[in-house]
């Protein structure tokens, strides 16, 4: 994924520079699981090359680069959501061999499809049920509770980070916006900066421990019941 090895026909968009001087690059996935021409598996799959320097991992890059990466995610989500058939856009990253990374050069992926995954559908259904019963968002309530407890990791005006109750993985962390919004495109500039700071903090700690990890954004194209957040799940075995 270094600049000199990129196939021009795969480039979707360059960010931060022209030609081979880009900082972040969006590519069509060379071996996509979904395509706009496949009726049975409709969608788009892109690779986001997070840096042109293959000697760097994301955790080592400055906070402003994290913010730029989030802006790229926002841009790609907006572009892909223009296709009205798209119901779900997953942004995810696999870092390290134990997390399933097959390429050393740091990258993440954007997966857009016309199918809402069953687990996302179930989460939305439970969120709606909670809201009907309690007249509030379940995640907004969880944020308030966790910011007062021992699982709190980081907090500022815009974001909240905590280790979830009964974590699936050691050192798991969830990053939430305090403002209720349903997807990444709704982030304002201040929230992008705070989210970048929080993500840099979490990934830097995992990098120091030498842990592989996956991260993925929980979001939907449009459903106010959903509360946008990011799960970071370390893989230590």
Language model features with spans:
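Active-site microenvironments that recognize anionic phosphate/pyrophosphate groups
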Residues: 1-105, 111-184, 190, 203-215, ...
